């Protein structure tokens, strides 16, 4: 439990996040549930000030996020991490920030390392692509992925070992070489609820990526930079498997990372034509794909609450219920 959380006035809680990624969804949901809201901006602060559901917009230097976190504690703030926070602030600062942070904070360390990611998925018993540490080990077509939450930037595909050996020389920084799995992509949104003691399927999406999804006519190299997301509803026959993977992943986090999942997370997959699902990635926090149902609610939320709810509202609902039951320490680290 966060030491700061013990000192909080539960009647005056605020919800805060970095002004990017899913901030609008998170803060809109928090305001609808009666919380004060704070957006912390590195840039584009004026854009966020136009929205009445954001009570305060701060500008900050993310190179010293500890100072920001200490100010948030003074405001009784609960912090919601997302992909931009992980990328801009970095997992080391995120681990040390003294503000109460939603979810398993230690998972951010695992999320920053592609090999540890694959280790955790394997521990969950979830089917994954083969992966390689050296180009000379690779077989068949592969995708090369950089470490960190980069939204697909810098990824590339190589058709064979020879092409890979040539192109890998230009890669700077840490990377993983994964088997390229043929099929369609699908990204699953889950919510781990300590309040209701369950893992919920909350939605799914497809990423819209350049130049893979662009009109390139074969003239440019495929790239995987994410520019947006598209909603997806799966065949119902696939839902039991998807849910099981989410439950198994939460169990693996408990056993391998020694902390409980709380709040949103995501498994990223390819579905083959034989309907098997291969998971190649996870995100241990809210993903931008949840923005596809902001304001209208996930089609799956009605299965649990009999009313539409987006992920920002789902987070706020969990916080409110946990505060009322005196179990906020199960959500925040």
From Swiss-Prot:
* Alphabetical GO biological process terms: 'de novo' IMP biosynthetic process
What is catalyzed by this enzyme?
A: 5-amino-1-(5-phospho-beta-D-ribosyl)imidazole-4-carboxamide + formate + ATP = 5-formamido-1-(5-phospho-D-ribosyl)imidazole-4-carboxamide + ADP + phosphate
E.C. number, please?
Answer: 6.3.4.23
Q: In the record's cofactor note, how is the cofactor described as bound?
A: Binds 1 Mg(2+) or Mn(2+) ion per subunit.
Protein's organism? Pyrobaculum calidifontis (strain DSM 21063 / JCM 11548 / VA1)
Q: Which GO terms describe its molecular function?
A: ATP binding; ligase activity, forming carbon-nitrogen bonds; magnesium ion binding
Q: What is this protein called?
A: 5-formaminoimidazole-4-carboxamide-1-(beta)-D-ribofuranosyl 5'-monophosphate synthetase
- Record's family? Belongs to the phosphohexose mutase family.
